[in-house]
Amino acid sequence: MVRTRIQRLLTGINRRMMKLLIALALIAYVASVWGNFVNMSKSIQENGEQKMEKKIEEVIAPLREKIQNLERSFTQKYPPVKFLSEKDRKRILITGGAGFVGSHLTDKLMMDGHEVTVVDNFFTGRKRNVEHWIGHENFELINHDVVEPLYIEVDQIYHLASPASPPNYMYNPIKTLKTNTIGTLNMLGLAKRVGARLLLASTSEVYGDPEVHPQSEEYWGHVNPIGPRACYDEGKRVAETMCYAYMKQEGVEVRVARIFNTFGPRMHMNDGRVVSNFILQALQGEQLTVYGSGEQTRAFQYVSDLVNGLVALMNSNVSSPVNLGNPQEHSIVQFARLIKQLVGSGGEISFLSEAQDDPQRRKPDIRKAKLLLGWEPVVPLEEGLNKTIHYFRKELEHQANNQYIPKPKPARVKKGRTRHN
């Protein structure tokens, strides 16, 4: 009986041990599963964190680059600027200051130590033409259309705002007229209010297809008032008239520069004028297109010469119109051959039908500028062309990554084509 009880006790103990062992095994299994789960969760978490870190890095990288660019811009070195005393330093407004000529004028006046405000609506101007001055304490850039009034305190106004290439002003003749009339009226009103001197950037186009050669300032011109280019030619003529009306009636100090063909870096490659057309065609190995016989003549000045002339005229006592141009005359076909030679490539010269209202000869008489301003062009034609060709090459490289560069074509108008500007 005692044995039976002992056996039952051992059996109970065995069952309890078995249950305990099973429980321990179950606990071990659960612990193992939990460990695997924890490890898996940890792995997933680590992978998730890595992915999250990668995504965060993708977002942060461009922001970091922008911050670095901003830091560089704060410490960037501007072109050397002269120091002028308060008495000598002028507050100067340049309308169209982000354009081809305007941006070079901006460089000149900034480096001379003046405070320069550039106003441009970027119809043809480009911010990158003046971006190297952004942030400088003497420089300000305003996005503004001169057909709207502008209120600003200045000492001098260089009024350059206007489309100047045939495709641009033929594309929007009304805007061209408004800029040259309403815009000029607004700038004259500003000059009257603040007592500033205004220089109008007029053009040799006021002479039209001249019957006098070379053209002096006394020549009244031969202009077609309803031709495809009349919006620009007549717009500048009426702008001159308004300047002298304000000078006579309101006592506004005005200067008028009649600018002849000008070229240089920052020209638009596709602006439709002869220099940009020929250089672009030669660099791309295409035929150089000449309209008419090619015997038409032009006189080309480099942009730095023009800028020096504008500054000299503004600071002079000469209130009557002054021609600013290079009196060295070249035929269009000679010019095409020269560019082809300097580029070292390009196709043959092709001749197309002559454009409407294309002046046969154009050459400035600059005796007045020589006598009264002590100014004349000094940059040789080939030197200026080589600088311009180098700039165009860089532009083509800059835009080469699958960007389309339109081939130079004349603007489409109802009658005729663009002329050899």
From Swiss-Prot:
Documented EC number(s): 4.1.1.35
Keywords: Decarboxylase, Glycoprotein, Golgi apparatus, Lyase, Membrane, NAD, Signal-anchor, Transmembrane, Transmembrane helix
Residues where NAD(+) binds: 99-101, 120-121, 123-125, 145-146, 160, 162, 179, 201, 232, 236, 262, 268, 273
InterPro entries according to UniProt: NAD(P)-bd_dom, NAD(P)-bd_dom_sf, UXS-like, UXS1_N
Protein topology in the membrane: Single-pass type II membrane protein
Cytoplasmic face residues: 1-19
UniProt-annotated glycosylation sites, renumbered to this chain: 317, 386
Pathway(s) it belongs to: Nucleotide-sugar biosynthesis; UDP-alpha-D-xylose biosynthesis; UDP-alpha-D-xylose from UDP-alpha-D-glucuronate: step 1/1
GO molecular function, one term: NAD+ binding
Cofactor(s) recorded in Swiss-Prot or TrEMBL: NAD(+)
Protein's cellular compartments: Golgi apparatus, Golgi stack membrane
Active site: 232
Biological process annotations from GO: D-xylose metabolic process; UDP-D-xylose biosynthetic process
Family per similarity comment: Belongs to the NAD(P)-dependent epimerase/dehydratase family. UDP-glucuronic acid decarboxylase subfamily.
Record PANTHER family: UDP-GLUCURONIC ACID DECARBOXYLASE 1 (PTHR43078:SF6), UDP-GLUCURONIC ACID DECARBOXYLASE-RELATED (PTHR43078)
Description of how the protein assembles with itself and partners: Homodimer and homotetramer.
Function: Catalyzes the NAD-dependent decarboxylation of UDP-glucuronic acid to UDP-xylose. Necessary for the biosynthesis of the core tetrasaccharide in glycosaminoglycan biosynthesis.
Protein name as catalogued: UDP-glucuronic acid decarboxylase 1
Organism, scientific name: Xenopus tropicalis (Western clawed frog)
Gene behind this protein: uxs1
